[in-house]
């Protein structure tokens, strides 16, 4: 198995399993973390709370990178009817509000939506997907289009929106409890107390992934924390990791397949939506989450408050 060393993997090690020199860098950068935390906290005050008449659920995390927000949002959509997903649309080549999907019809391009939004759009149980830097406008548009429930992807820090906050707590925790850049936290860890529900893997949800072994496949991925796929590394002939949200080029993928004499790309669905038009044979790594009763019942109780 080969491995492309890059910035994304360096960040994984820096935040979660630092070596001696990375630990030294952490303390050099600590004054910047204090400033970052100050302004992050300041940004959570002095804004009027906006309340909606229908359920708004936020799935977020405090730490940098992916913790499974996308599969958890999908799991909620499988459990409840009429779910629209609203997200920022990170790394998209557009600005403003775009309706990516409405009632099972995809309405824009990958460039306009971004990879995460397009991944949601291919999920049958999700009735609509909207990207917008302004989450309030996105929520309003979703309800206008008939959403029964809005699920916000990565909106824990939007404290001006009245919502049910689910905070994902991964089994793999940052090495230091500092905010960026000396630690992985985007808000001070004490902000966990502002969550309505802290979802712990194993207790509140079960994460599972599957892909068949294929010696003629090259695993390529551009997701945060690629070590989440560790169990699948040995199932492909070679593995290559790219920066989160990386825009794959057809020629470079062709070269990787030729280099290892392979005919198949092994990738996550988030990666697949970016290469599906290239004509490659693809093998999808299934990444799913199943809700356990503790989380499912909390969400049901919250939704029932709007039925009274």
UniProtKB/Swiss-Prot annotation:
Annotated coiled-coil segments of the chain: none
Signal peptide (residue range): none
GO annotation terms (biological process): lipid A biosynthetic process; lipopolysaccharide core region biosynthetic process
Domain of life: Bacteria
Keywords for this protein: ATP-binding, Kinase, Lipid A biosynthesis, Lipid biosynthesis, Lipid metabolism, Nucleotide-binding, Transferase
A Pfam short name: LpxK
EC class: transferase
Record-listed E.C. numbers: 2.7.1.130
Entry's transmembrane regions: none
Catalytic reactions of this protein: a lipid A disaccharide + ATP = a lipid IVA + ADP + H(+)
Binding site for ATP: 63-70
GO molecular function: ATP binding; tetraacyldisaccharide 4'-kinase activity
Gene Ontology CC terms, in alphabetical order: plasma membrane
Pathway membership, UniProt: Glycolipid biosynthesis; lipid IV(A) biosynthesis; lipid IV(A) from (3R)-3-hydroxytetradecanoyl-[acyl-carrier-protein] and UDP-N-acetyl-alpha-D-glucosamine: step 6/6
NCBIfam families associated with the record: PRK00652.1-5
Function summary: Transfers the gamma-phosphate of ATP to the 4'-position of a tetraacyldisaccharide 1-phosphate intermediate (termed DS-1-P) to form tetraacyldisaccharide 1,4'-bis-phosphate (lipid IVA).
Protein name, as recorded: Tetraacyldisaccharide 4'-kinase
Gene name of the encoded protein: lpxK
């Amino acid at each position: 198995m080969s491995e492309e060393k890059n910035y994304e993997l360096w960040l994984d090690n820096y935040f979660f399993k630092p070596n001696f020199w990375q630990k030294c860098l952490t303390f050099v950068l600590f004054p910047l973390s204090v400033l970052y935390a100050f302004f992050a906290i300041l940004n959570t005050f002095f804004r009027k709370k906006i309340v909606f008449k229908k359920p708004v659920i936020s799935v977020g995390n405090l730490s940098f990178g992916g913790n499974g927000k996308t599969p958890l949002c999908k799991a909620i959509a499988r459990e409840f009817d009429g779910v629209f997903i609203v997200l920022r649309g990170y790394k998209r080549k557009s600005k403003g509000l775009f309706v990516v999907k409405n009632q099972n019809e995809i309405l824009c391009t990958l460039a306009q939506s971004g990879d995460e939004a397009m991944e949601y759009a291919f999920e049958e149980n999700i009735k609509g997907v909207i990207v917008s830097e302004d989450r309030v406008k996105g929520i309003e548009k979703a309800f206008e289009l008939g959403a029964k429930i809005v699920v916000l992807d990565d909106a824990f820090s939007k404290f001006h929106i009245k919502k049910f906050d689910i905070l994902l707590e991964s089994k793999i925790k940052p090495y230091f409890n500092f905010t960026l850049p000396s630690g992985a936290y985007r808000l001070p860890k004490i902000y966990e107390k502002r969550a309505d529900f802290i979802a712990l893997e194993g207790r509140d949800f079960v994460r599972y992934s599957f892909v068949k072994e294929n010696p003629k496949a090259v695993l390529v991925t551009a997701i945060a924390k690629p070590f989440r796929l560790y169990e699948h590394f040995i199932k492909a002939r070679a593995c290559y990791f790219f920066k989160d949200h990386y825009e794959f080029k057809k020629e470079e993928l062709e070269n990787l397949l030729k280099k290892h004499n392979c005919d198949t790309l092994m990738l996550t669905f988030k990666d697949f939506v970016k290469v599906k038009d290239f004509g490659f044979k693809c093998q999808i790594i299934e990444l799913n989450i199943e809700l356990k009763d503790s989380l499912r019942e909390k969400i049901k109780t919250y939704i029932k408050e709007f039925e009274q």
